[in-house]
Amino acid sequence: MLALAAPDKASLYHHRPNGAESFELAITAHDCTYSALCHDPSHRSMTKPAAPKDGRLNLSFLLLASNPVHNSMDVTIAAEPERTSEMPAWRQRDTETTAWDVGTVDPRFLLLDLSDMLLDEPQNYCDTENNSWQFSGIFNAPTTSVDILSARVATLSNTLHDMAINKPHLKQGFDQSCQRGFFTASHFQNVLIFFFRRRHYHKDTIHWPTFDPDKVAVHSLLAVVLTGTVYLECLDQSPSSYLTTSLLELSEKYIYKELKSLVDQNTTPVTSRHMLEICQAAVLMNTLEGSSNHIEARRRIASKRIPTLVATLRKSGMIGLKHLPDESWETFIHRETCIRVAAWTFINDSLMALFCNNPPIMTAKEMTGYLPCANDIWEADSSVAFQERAEQKLIRSYPSSYNEAVAGILADEWTAVMRESFGKLDASDLFYVCASLLRHLFHCRTAAVSPDYPLMLLRALDRWDSLWPDAYERIPEDDRRWLGIAKHTPEVIAISRRAIKLIGTEEAKTSAYLQGIATYDTAVFHEFVQQFGQESQGGKAKN
């Protein structure tokens, strides 16, 4: 694993893997001998443990993601498929706008590596120094586009360099990232494609059909490239580690400095595209650093950055945003982006509560805006496609929000009509509903509650379990591979149930995690899953 390297790595992370652990990680992540050339997801993670035969749920995702020997919880992306047949819209626009006179030949043909054309995929996403013409889709972007991107990359590099001068403790790590080639147009181009092809992993806040690296706020461009670089390094397709904790912290400061400036000017992301892009960048940084195995970074995100972003969203009214009838495509994109930024802020807050016992600052009750829309609507690449897909589907029926969903699933009554309404939620919706339940789990474990409260929550988890199989089965088989981290939601529900059942028991006294004390070392949660996660999941509450 190469992500998030730092000058003094041993002092920043839980511990460095020993020889045995390194060997185990190597065989787990790279069963295919020719991993640098192989892009077949079936050749990855072939040594994962088989599902238990006694009906218990395999918690391999939670164990892998929380394992402190990994530098990022996003290590699980190594097992994700890649949407190799797709090309981002800005690359298509570049190709369309590059015209050549009749009878002339594009000179880039003369520089092609013809051997690589025989492969389905480029040999190495990061091999730009040795073969800068082999990358994705054969053609590079037009010179004008490269020049614009190069100028933007240089601007970012210079800005962060100036910030590092005033932060001497961050300068060495930042210089290492520069020396390794992070701030190059070729790296940005390659990582943008890489992230685009794995955009399904997290439920995306980026609207890729209209995303343009030449025009988007440089703060957002930086956050996207940092996230894509983490993905790249989790697959070990990078010749060296581009990322250092110094680069991440400087980037985080840069993005939140701009956010504060806009808030001070009373700018609102509901009407300002630039501020919305800054909020997108903030969400990406919260997700990225919250997932990193860096204790201080995770503490900073949980205690400082997420609260700052939440305050901004509350002030702007983004948390309660809904779609309007007969929205134009442009209006839809902006409002749906607002909805997704609020949703992922809520999710990050929930995950900090689950993994770190960090008290959540948002409530499901205040989340009165729409749940994110279906991906087929979100990924419409034109106004015509949007209108065709959005008809009868954009204005949501009950339950349309986190607030309605969690109130309904916790309710005493669970009528046939309610069951039918909740049965229309798709797998992604249930992923969001799970995030709402995590706040109740935290409250149940850490506060004085009535004896009925744990039973109510167990009943809600059972209802969720009854909804998931049908929602999953409705997904076409070929599309299930694009479900991303949402496909692991049953594991979160299972460990939540186990935590509730342990409340007040003698066993609970042996678990550091169940003491409810905030800790930003994932080893504590990892040990809890190891110790209690594989217990029988029988004895569910009555619906």
For each predicted feature, which ranges?
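Cys2His2 zinc-finger metal-binding sites
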Residues: 3-6, 20, 26
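Cys/His-coordinated zinc-binding microdomains
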Residues: 7-10, 21, 33-36
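Short functional micro-motifs and their immediate structural scaffolds
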Residues: 11-14, 25, 31, 110-111
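Intrinsically disordered, low-complexity activation-like regions
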Residues: 30-227, 250-268, 280-295, 299, ...
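Structural signature of alpha-solenoid helical repeat junctions
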Residues: 216, 220, 277-280, 337, ...
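Specific register positions within alpha-helical solenoid repeats of the TPR/Sel1-like families, i.e.
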Residues: 229, 233, 290, 438, ...
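Long amphipathic alpha-helical scaffold regions
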Residues: 243, 268-273, 277
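C-terminal substrate/ligand-recognition segments
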Residues: 483, 487-508
